[in-house]
Amino acid sequence: MRSTLLFVAILALSLAWSLGAACEESQEQLMPGGGHSKKDSNLYQLPSSLLRRLCDSRSISLDGLLKMLSKASVGAKESSLPQKRDMHDFFVGLMGKRNIQPGTPVDGNQENAPSLGTFKYPPSVE
């Protein structure tokens, strides 16, 4: 869950940094003598009105980021239970046995199960 939040935060920061660079480039292109070619301007194929709106509304994007992070944390909690169950079933299949939880009936007859005998610890160990 923390790694997901960290990834989203890094992604948001890098996106904000790249949008800030795009806003600076678009403002430099508006000024004469910017020295940028058309190839540089094609790197960001967003309309200039959208770039201006994104650059001017930093608080809205932060609110959206916080909402997205809260949704991601809620989604991570919900999806972690099935993933744990799947991993448990995978390892149970590898081991060939299943943990018996208290309060659940046991399939099969335990009287017919082979036993290894009773092992008693020497008195010095206890």
Curated annotation (Swiss-Prot):
Pfam families: Neurokinin_B. This is Neurokinin-B. GO terms for biological process: neuropeptide signaling pathway; positive regulation of blood pressure; tachykinin receptor signaling pathway. It is found in: Secreted. Residues 101-126 are annotated as: Disordered. It comes from the Eukaryota. It comes from Sus scrofa (Pig). One of its GO terms (cellular component) is extracellular region. The lineage of its organism: Eukaryota, Metazoa, Chordata, Craniata, Vertebrata.
